[in-house]
Amino acid sequence: MTDCTQQKTIQLSFPVTYWTDYFTAMLLLPYGRYRACRYFRQPFVQDFPFLSSVLRLSCKYFICIPRRQCLERLQSYFPTTLAEWDRRERMSLAPDGHYDPRHEIPSPIHVINLARELNVGSILPAAFYDLARYGTSKTAGGTEPLPRLVLEVPSSEDSPASASTSTSTSTSTSTFAPTFVPSSWTASSSEATCGASRFTSPMLVQDTTPVRLSHDDLVLTFRGRETMQRSVSAFLSSQVKDRPPSAGCTVPGAGQACRDAFYFITLNTLRAVGGIAAGRDGDPLFTLGQMIDMLHHTEWVDGQYLRGLPMCGKCRDEFIPAVHAGRQAIWDQIPAWFALEPYDILKARDDELNERDMYP
């Protein structure tokens, strides 16, 4: 099946195939082939260790159905269209309005590394954009590694994996173990204390070494972040700061009240650039969306009263489409900001691979 295998004969003359892949990864492949639709109903952050293992093996051994299912799952959270991105962002909001994407979506560092490894280009623009919204120190520091499935307890009791399995075996299994692991595989406390020579039940262990981007991808992320921030200031200068009133403006005094409203939008955008106040640092798409939300706010103080922005309906009707066009322009430029090909080329290449029985 692969040039990485070799045939040997043991004492009983049975052929034995030696695989270079981890047995735990091979264990997941049948579930990805026949039961992926069921297990992909879990939150993506819980599915990702399973998905990445199945995707690697399905690409390596030319198994088209699980490969297509895994890619579709990835593309649903790292899309190529602005409408799908907005849907993803709405899904990341907690019931109280708190933005917590990592509760539903794995770190983009894992996604970028996986996409680079398997040459899946269509998910890279959204993943780079997702990562570039965070501070530089947080990006450079990396993220925690994914839990990994093991079948044998390490011999070193002071190793991170051993400490994780020996002190909290039952907790780790119940918290992180995917539902496709049969209940009969649950590890007992006596098995968890056995030596390295004895196999135990499959369990997920957590390493401690952070996972980081490659140097080239880290540089691309920082450069893209700077360009993202400049896009906000460019939009403010061209579409908001000195925006004239509409030709049909109904406000007396040459539309001075509408000019003041645009000034207030500019000022409040600069006060919370990139959504810092909302915990969304460096997000120009969110920042421009907030400009539309400001039109409906009623907390503007006029003396002792709270009012909405003093903007007439005509100016409002012209400003909202300009903001939508600005958001779409930002989205269309994201691949170029991170030295990637356009969306349609990346998507077409991945779709072409999905339709084939094997990679070229």
Model-derived features: positions:
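Short amphipathic alpha-helical linker/capping segments at the junctions of internal repeats
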Residues: 1, 77, 134-136
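Structural preference for solvent-exposed beta-strand-turn elements
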Residues: 73-82
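N-terminal BTB/POZ boundary and linker segment
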Residues: 1, 12, 17, 21-51, ...
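Short, recurring structural edge motifs at helix starts
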Residues: 7-11, 38-44, 52-55, 59, ...
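Acidic, serine/threonine- and proline-rich low-complexity regulatory tracts
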Residues: 83-166, 175-360
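Alpha-helical oligomerization interface recognition
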Residues: 1-3, 62
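Short, structured motif recognition centered on aromatic/hydrophobic residues
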Residues: 19-27, 48-55, 63-69, 74, ...
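Short, flexible domain-boundary/linker segments around small modular repeats
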Residues: 4, 33-36, 92-98
